Amino acid sequence: MEENSNKFEQELKEIGQDRNQFPHISVEESLQEFDSFSNKIENESKQFGAQKDPESYMAGGETEEDFKLRKYFENSERMHLENGGNEKKMGVSIRNLTVVGLGADASVIADMSTPFFSILNFFKPSFWTKKTSTFDILHDVTTFCKDGEMVLVLGRPGAGCSTLLRVIANQTASYVSVKGDVRYGGIPSKEFERYRAESIYTPEEDSHHPTLTVRETLDFALKCKTPGNRLPDETKRSFREKVFNLLLSMFGIVHQADTIVGNEYVRGLSGGERKRLTITEAMVSSASITCWDCSTRGLDAASAFDYAKSIRIMSDTLHKTTIASFYQASDSIYNVFDKVCVLEKGRCIYFGPVGMAKQYFMSLGFDCEPRKSTPDFLTGVTNPQERIIKKGFEGRTPETSADFEAAWKNSDIYRDQLQEQKEYEELIERTQPKVAFVQEVKDENSKTNFKKSQYTTSFITQVVALTKRNFQLILNDKFGLFTKYLSVLIQAFVYSSVFYNMASDINGLFTRGGAILSAVIFNAFLSVGEMSMTFIGRRVLQKHKSYALYRPSALHIAQVVNDIPFTLLQVFLFSIIAYFMFGLEYDGGKFFIFSFTLVGASLACTALFRCFGYLCPSMYIAQNISNVFIIFMLTYSGYTVPIPKMHPWFSWFRHINIFTYAFKAIMANEFEGKEFNCLESAIPYGPAYQGSEFDAYRICPLGGIEQGSLYFKGEFYMDKTLRFKEGEMSQNVIIVYCWWIFFVICNMLAMEYIDHTSGGYTHKVYKKGKAPKMNDVEEEKQQNAIVANATNNMKDTLHMDGGIFTWQNIRYTVKVPGGERLLLNNIEGWIKPGQMTALMGSSGAGKTTLLDVLAKRKTLGVVEGDSHLNGRELEIDFERITGYVEQMDVHNPGLTVREALRFSAKLRQEPEVSLEEKFKYVEHVLEMMEMKHLGDALIGTLETGVGISVEERKRLTIGVELVAKPQILFLDEPTSGLDAQSSYNIIKFIRKLADAGMPLVCTIHQPSSVLFEHFDRILLLAKGGKTVYFGDIGEKSKTLTSYFERHGVRPCTESENPAEYILEATGAGVHGKSDVNWPETWKQSPELADISRELAALKEQGAQQYKIRSDGPAREFSQSTWYQTKEVYKRLNLIWWRDPYYTYGSFVQSALCGLIIGFTFWNLQGSSSDMNQRIFFIFEALMLGILLIFVVMPQLISQREYFKRDFASKFYSWFPFAISIVVVELPFIVISGTIFFFCSFWTAGLDKTSDSEQTFYFWFIFVIFLFFCVSFGQAVAAVCINMFFAMTLIPLLIVFLFLFSGVMTPPSSIPTFWRGWVYHLNPCRYFMEGIVTNILKTVDVKCSYEDMITFTFPKSYNTCQNYTSAFQSYGPSGYVESSILNGEPACSYCIYKNGEQYYKTLGWSDDNRWRNVGIIICFFVFNILMVILFVYLTRKGSR
């Protein structure tokens, strides 16, 4: 064994490690739990080794007890090398690195005035000479990391830690410029771009598909990263299973393998478990260089240490180069690393061995407090409020980042590191590790993959894996899938009933065209929903792209593969019902062509709308573009505007229109060879003309047909009326599929080369003129002075009136498949003024769940037990008077930081407090949170990369609660994701709140010793939601530690962190174990009995000490409903103003559609065909209104999520939000409607037949109709739980709107069932009646020669009047006049005499115009009531 030990030490030295730097780490002890898994691996190794040399794989024949995780990795690496593999030893060397970013004033918050100022600035000479503002994110940084080494990067927010990691990971696209020399094992950074998968960056936020399980998430990643050079006899499946089980065991998520991941809106893994999944997924990539950015966020201290040890072992054994940035690192984690790089304001102020860093800064004159961790000390020296200067060094220590950098570059350690870096680079030059690296990368590639590919697996393998994952995503949403196909079935029956069993006469001729076009439109509307799906999962795609898991184009191919079976089913369900109920030709071949064409059209439309999504940065831009295209495609399909009526400036569009080719193909399929008759409708008609002798003198009212032809073929109608060429059916079907392929290729290219995500990089934008100077020395001094002043004045501004809050026998049960699960088990405790209680436990112990229960945030499950405030039952105002800092940072992105804080203060502080005082307190909180310089910065979103960072969002979350001056404060991991200094400020601030009289409880994962000392009491939970300890912490934690020492735990040393000590003692962490059943021990302890007695005493004390309120009953909300409504409206109006994509998008859409429709129906005349064109003009305007529904739904759904968060904290009620989000749209709707009106009304020539009253009426009813459409979309969105469900439901509802409007099917032709109620309940019907009668009532029809139906008459009648007198006595519309045909006397019939005749055939009257306006307004009001109702019903989120 001694020989083995010596060999082990020798291996460590070869790797370049000095284990003496961290003697307290016991790898053997930390890896006991891997024994069972290791035994399995050992057996596999022995079986393989039996064929070769068994002793070489077992590291000298260690016993089973010695075979730990380290040995597993060592054996795996050894086996790999002996089978011809190569080592990937890729260190990183950086010299004189300067990274330049955009200055804070380079861009300002965009709003509706931005386009105007941009246009004005374009003509200013200064615009062309002004230089873009920039600043140095990193300045002249020189550092390196050898293969197998670990470097810890420390720094406060804004120091440049994340930027350094991104540059090392070769992700530099977000920066203005990157100067300096970066080499990877001797390979320049430019050349290393081809090995993207070998240097990865893992950002601090977690990006996953929330509906996938842990198993599905990791199995997919493994399928994409399964190497080609596996061990002999090792299949792809066995490799994946081995690595999957290993990683789940390493990070303690074995039991969560089949749990969905979840996110802030979907229940799933806890925050800590989700973080472990992020780490695990990154490790699957098997990169040579890994950069971890705050990867311990959300992990408890024990789990964070386990994670650090795991990457230590992998770095040692697999020669991984590891660079990590931790905001809060304990000494245990710190000592795992080899070197540390300390940054401040973009400058390197120390780089060298971890063991020398503390001494270096102490030599500069700084002192370290007892029990303060080294990482906290290293970052704290840069903060004037935290650093301690030794006596005798006053005025001699560095003050600014430039001073620290100068001191560093004058030090001996700096010169030593430069020398070591030079020697390392010389070693690289001699050994040329890149040769083995390049060969290994080639060998890892799949045999079916290109050798120079950046990806491990082939394109086909990627597509197969993505296809399976996409199927899982679809099938995991069973409710959405069910509702989609239910909607398809309902729509099929609705369409079929309207066009049921169409006759083979001339009336059936026209309705067949409408039915076929409706079938094409139906599939298009369903496809629109796919566009919004392209915006979901963009961050996941960006992450996977950076990991080189798959080509983005492979994702689209997989989506297309997924589309095919679901589209086939969708079209089959529709076709099997619609085709035969329509009464189309009962022919199997024709049914197949009908369905096959619809499938192609649906796939092509899906690809087209996805293309808009991929090309556009905003969903609203994409939706507006798609709406314009739908109007264009519908107008030029060949049905609403026949080809002879198309003007040359737009007629070209029919050649690139999917609808045109699909419509022509299905029309040809149905009409070719089919015979129609016009026996009943031939002119003249009536009993007097029924004899066979009159057949030769009657004519079908169909252009181009010969007199006497009462039967005709469908080809004749297609040729003469529609101008569709014969024999083009097959060609048109092929073209439809060609368009599909074309858009698929476009989408592949768009996904490969267009990336609208930021890759985790956030760029701040400020109000105009409010941007601070970046990394400026003077600005730095001013900021330090502000924080110092705020700290000194804290006590003067904090006045709290807290109470005693108790809870007893709290149990929380949720339903799970197969039964129920108890998450909290008889928890009891209290918080009272002046005390600060810590809530601790391992990840998944139930800390967040307990806070949710105590704060009355739970809406699901069963809560049992008693909670009392001041000895009394909780009242209706409890949520308002308590602050709850949640783990997830949910903020409205359209506000600035200061606006968000002021909004909270205005609505949650008592109404008696003046606005001036509220705003003054907001400024104080901004200063204390070190966010004064961010006050005018836009919050933004991480997806777009515009806004504040993850860490700044956490501080804002805390600030939003603090400005409300709550009486009780619950904080769920308030320091998670914050740096040590920010954490210290937060805890110190909270301590001040407690000292001022606020009771509070705070969950905390990784408290340093300094932070932990601020707490008075602790509630420690074990997994299963059971109490381990509740009581005082005591001076220097003696009371707490003595409890555990009394039950057999080793004593806690003076230098040890008590928080880490108790987590270790209770078996927390990934693989933590304890021989003591701590929950049972607590039940038997005398402390529990004391707790029970004190609880009873506190209830009585609270009831006596705190009088019943004298200001009347408790108020749920602080402010009146009117005040809430005013403030909510102002906020929403500001958000709309700052979203030009949304507001101007609707304006541009209205302008384009107005111009397209206006120029399509250019300068309409008085002929009968022009009157039909007037009807279709109005129908297109109606479709524009309907398409606006798609635009407004995402806005309400997204804003509702922010409302739920605000409502939970009782900012405002449901009514102010519901009414405000409707009213805020109205002015923008008026502008949109007016733009459309001006672009189309005069262009189409409608002014020639309209007086001023008719013109005003047209504008007014159109705007009112837009009010209805927008509010209808909002009402539907309010009903739906998510965007997918909304996009599934809305096509079904739109069918009723346009199908029963009286245009697609005349009212007399609508089936009695629908005509009896749906027709009369359809707002579009009243819109069409009002606007059609308004336009046509003054139109006198004078048929053109082409529109006249001319026919001869028997000579015995002498004159046309004699022949048609009987016909005219029947009261037909239109007029008859004498004419000449081929030199013979004839009659010419014009189908309409005036517009009134047309709309009277529909049962409409111009007397109902203003009545119809009133009815539409009633529908608008009804929609508002529906929005209010469903906002009320869904006001509480599911949690």
From Swiss-Prot:
- Which parts pass through the membrane? 479-499, 516-536, 564-584, 589-609, 614-634, 734-754, 1144-1164, 1175-1195, 1217-1237, 1256-1276, 1283-1303, 1413-1433
Which stretches are tagged as biased composition: Basic and acidic residues?
A: 1-17
Which segments carry the region annotation Disordered? 1-21
Domain annotation ABC transporter: ranges: 117-370, 805-1049
Task: Give UniProt keywords alphabetically.
Answer: ATP-binding, Membrane, Nucleotide-binding, Repeat, Transmembrane, Transmembrane helix, Transport
Q: Which GO terms describe its molecular function?
A: ABC-type transporter activity; ATP binding; ATP hydrolysis activity; ATPase-coupled transmembrane transporter activity
- UniProt-listed Pfam families: ABC2_membrane, ABC2_membrane_7, ABC_tran, ABC_trans_N, PDR_CDR
Q: How does it sit in the membrane?
A: Multi-pass membrane protein
Its localization reads: Membrane
**GO CC field:** membrane
Q: What family does the Swiss-Prot or TrEMBL record give for this protein?
A: Belongs to the ABC transporter superfamily. ABCG family. PDR (TC 3.A.1.205) subfamily.
* Protein name (database record): ABC transporter G family member 14
* Species whose genome carries this gene: Dictyostelium discoideum (Social amoeba)
Its encoding gene is what?
A: abcG14
